[in-house]
Amino acid sequence: MASKFRLLLENAEQIVVVCTKEEQYLLEDGMQHLAVLEKSSLVIGNDGCIKAVGPAETIRNHFSNASFENIIDCSGKCILPGFVDAHIHPVWAGDRVHEFAMKLAGATYMDIHQAGGGINYTVEHTTAASVEELFCSFKHRLERMLRAGTTLVECKSGYGLKLETELKMLRVIERAHRELDIAVSSTYCGAHSVPKGKSAQEAADDIINNHLPALKQMSLNGEIHVDNIDVFCEKGVFDLESTGRILQAGKAIGLNLNFHGDELNPMNSAELGAELGAHAVSHLEEVSDKGIAALAKAKCSAVLLPTTAYILRLKQPRARDMLKAGVIVSLGSDFNPNAYCFSMPMVMHLACVNMKMSLKEALAAATINAAYALGRAHTHGSLEVGKQGDVVVINASRWEHVIYQFGGHQELIECVVIKGKIVYKNEKFSICRMDLLK
């Protein structure tokens, strides 16, 4: 009896498989040898996982008696892994478009924050919003990210600060995890800012004594699934001591450490992350040489966010120094009311232009390395047999177009596939429905 499969993508000009030896991440040298197949095809099974990838003729011969739910002719096109966005803040109400003009006039991030804007403004509006309002806007944002090729996102809470609103946000993230196609890595970020009327010490005590026990109980009950814990380690927010206490308490209940550090001021956050065994530290615009060395030794990923440096006019993260030192460099969009970017292709473009990363380095950082930062490199980030069948098909004969083109990706990206199912297709896209490959 002929075997049945979910999807065949055939005759692609290029397939960027990224890795071929089950690597969990790529360092600088490995990035230069990014695995790209020419004139190839890819098969995804009914379980949503990749069954074969290789030369088109080989695949055609091997699967000559197989049937497929869908077949996509990728002649003249390229196939890439679904992009992984390793850092976003997508659940909130009340945009901050008015603050953009303030930044253009010279106000700094902390100027706005200390005046009651920034995170505090969003906390007020998010607290007032209903669960349904938050979910609808959140769903719309994730759908926009998916149309730009993202198939796995890290989603943070952090615009509640008080336990009730933080749990409301985590429930919204959990609903997305259960109902939407895009994969979600959930992050508790109750230490995103110090609530009004509290000191950092008091806020840390509240998180450790009240928030985390509630999270643990809800996780045990199956109400929510939280993967990571985040803290904004910054001058005027949570100092190094408070950050360490919160992270250690989170680690004690099974959460992965993945936090903001060394963004606006040098805080020794990278060193702390390495010491505590963090999966990742984000931002790192102000990281020290010692911090870079510590990240490399600990295999702690540096999640760099070129949109933030661009919008806030900060100095660029030291991507080249990190790569040379052996750091696992990842990328994220930092989507939030302060950095309104849905597109990982644009993030990769900025990483190349402003952080001096190469095209291959940027793609690896937005796929396998970003998956590593989220603890998902075994399922996402490359197109290897056994991994989840998440792919992006672009209408170009060279994969580099997805980074080279600055914007307009709604025309370039023909379709996005998650677990072998076509979850987005542009208006010009067509598929072949065939019972048998002949």
From Swiss-Prot:
GO molecular function per UniProt: imidazolonepropionase activity; metal ion binding
Cofactor field: Zn(2+); Fe(3+)
Keywords: Histidine metabolism, Hydrolase, Iron, Metal-binding, Zinc
Catalytic activity annotation: 4-imidazolone-5-propanoate + H2O = N-formimidoyl-L-glutamate
Residue positions binding 4-imidazolone-5-propanoate: Y159, H192, E263
Cellular-component GO terms for this entry: cytoplasm
Pfam family name, one: Amidohydro_1
Residues where N-formimidoyl-L-glutamate binds: Y159, N336
Residues annotated as binding Fe(3+): H260, D334
Cofactor note as given: Binds 1 zinc or iron ion per subunit.
Binding-site residues, Zn(2+): H260, D334
Pathway: Amino-acid degradation; L-histidine degradation into L-glutamate; N-formimidoyl-L-glutamate from L-histidine: step 3/3
InterPro entries recorded: Amidohydro-rel, HutI, Metal-dep_hydrolase_composite, Metal_Hydrolase
Its EC number(s): 3.5.2.7
Keyword Metal-binding found: yes
EC category name: hydrolase
GO biological process: L-histidine catabolic process; L-histidine catabolic process to glutamate and formamide; L-histidine catabolic process to glutamate and formate
Keyword Iron: yes
Family classification: Belongs to the metallo-dependent hydrolases superfamily. HutI family.
Protein name per its UniProtKB record: Probable imidazolonepropionase
Species for this entry: Xenopus laevis
Gene: amdhd1
